A protein has these predicted regions:
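Generic hydrophobic, amphipathic alpha-helix propensity
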Residues: 11-20, 36, 61-65, 69-73, ...
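Amphipathic alpha-helical linker/stalk segments
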Residues: 63-88, 117-126, 141
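Amphipathic C-terminal alpha-helical segment
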Residues: 96, 134, 138, 158-176, ...
Length: 198
């Protein structure tokens, strides 16, 4: 009979989530492997067995954040209506950030000084924008969106959603500002601004 695996994917995900919470709440100095292991109810041996080292753990956090983010964006159903699809992708972006704010900080704010993702992690991060790029290319090809370089629309759209989401998560918006309503209107205004003119 095979021995049960004690260091499984469930433990790996618990460790990643807790590590992200520690970093986003108290900064990278709060990430002690001993504290992390204790918080999750395991041993430091398990942490080293699953990740190898502290830098490898941070890289795994980065990868996991983009894996979840990419999964959510790829799950958005395409309707063929460029504006509706761009709005839906923007809403999925925000939902992903809200679901995993502790990972979002590691993905986009370089909250761990000196951390540089390895080549595979960097490739995965760049691939998460493919659903947005594909939607824009399809919108241009169908004549719905303006015939401009797709990268211009991609970066502009990404900048809008990333900026608003980052301001929201960091608490830098005025308390009376209703993010939900303004966010969707901003997404729609951006998308319609890129429509082809007759």
């Amino acid at each position: 009979m095979a021995r049960p695996r004690t260091h499984d994917d469930a433990l790996r995900l618990k460790l990643l989530d807790r590590a992200g919470e520690l970093i986003s709440a108290d900064g990278p100095k709060a990430l002690s492997l001993r504290k992390l292991a204790a918080d999750v109810g395991t041993s430091t041996t398990a942490v080293y067995s699953l990740f190898g080292s502290k830098p490898d753990l941070v890289n795994a956090l980065y990868v996991e954040g983009f894996r979840r983010f990419g999964e959510r964006l790829r799950a958005v159903a395409r309707t063929g209506d460029a504006v509706a699809d761009l709005v839906s992708l923007g809403l999925a972006y925000r939902a992903s950030a809200q679901a995993d704010p502790h990972l979002y900080a590691i993905m986009f704010t370089r909250s761990v000084p000196g951390f540089e993702p390895n080549a595979e992690a960097d490739r995965l991060a760049r691939a998460t924008l493919e659903p947005l790029e594909e939607t824009i290319r399809a919108g241009i090809a169908s004549g719905q969106l303006a015939d401009v370089a797709p990268e211009v629309i991609t970066v502009s759209s990404w900048g809008l959603v990333h900026g608003l989401v980052s301001l929201e998560l960091s608490g830098n918006l005025p308390p009376e500002f209703s993010v939900g309503g303004a966010y969707e209107k901003a997404l729609r205004a951006n998308a319609t601004g890129w429509l082809a003119t007759p």
